[in-house]
Amino acid sequence: MALPEFSMRQLLEAGVHFGHQTQRWNPRMSPFIYGARNGIHILDLTQTVPMLDQALKAVRDTVAKGGRVLFVGTKRQASGPIAEAAEKSAQYYMNHRWLGGTLTNWKTVSQSIQRLRMIDEKMEGGAEGLTKKERLGMERDQAKLQASLGGIREMGGVPDLLFVIDVKKEALAIAEANKLGIPVVAVVDTNCSPDGVDYIIPGNDDAARAISLYCDLAARAALDGMTAQLGAAGVDLGELEEAPAEEALAEEAAAEA
């Protein structure tokens, strides 16, 4: 099983090494800081490279064992890449707002998912028997529930691993995962604490290019895991009528060619 490859140059070009202003640092991140330049902390990429590799291995191994990965990133610049990565690797995501109790109170969350399914069915059936006002209200509910729960509606239970962008913003998600003993992979910037993170990726968590790179690598690691899982089950990917995440696998093959 080959992990997705990346180079130090790619990390540099994406700005992974740029931390925050030195006065905004969290001392818990000092072991991963190389130095400072123009009042900005610079992360030590010689540490980020092997740690990112370990994090990707955790993603791949989780999926290879049949586990579920939940991608979490609710801030503006992470929202798109998080959803895209999860969708192309047949995983799950939260990219709108973390709902308290998503993990620790899954029963209630699954009831909301059930409500979303019922609304979807009703709307697909033309919302018969509803007044215009009721229909509008239902459309609003549908949009709200879809934004909050659309990425986890098929998850079917708590995930086996969390992949997080911005530990400060997603502190509640990490706390819930810690409480349930769910391992956490996360990008940790110089202004954050790595506490509660099992697989730390020291890196910039604000730059769009850096976020896209992390998400793309994690998606590819998940796809590697899926290929391994199907291979172990004796499934020939070439014989499947509809290969899982077929488009993503084809893209990967094209990129390697």
Swiss-Prot record:
CDD domains (UniProt xref): RPS2
Protein name as catalogued: Small ribosomal subunit protein uS2
Key words, A-Z: Ribonucleoprotein, Ribosomal protein
PANTHER family per UniProt: 30S RIBOSOMAL PROTEIN S2 PROKARYOTIC AND ORGANELLAR, SMALL RIBOSOMAL SUBUNIT PROTEIN US2M
GO molecular function per UniProt: structural constituent of ribosome
Any Gene Ontology biological process: translation
GO annotation, cellular component aspect: cytosolic small ribosomal subunit
Family named by the database record: Belongs to the universal ribosomal protein uS2 family.
Keyword Amino-acid biosynthesis: no
UniProt key word Zinc: no
Pfam family, one: Ribosomal_S2
Signal peptide: none
Superkingdom classification of source: Bacteria
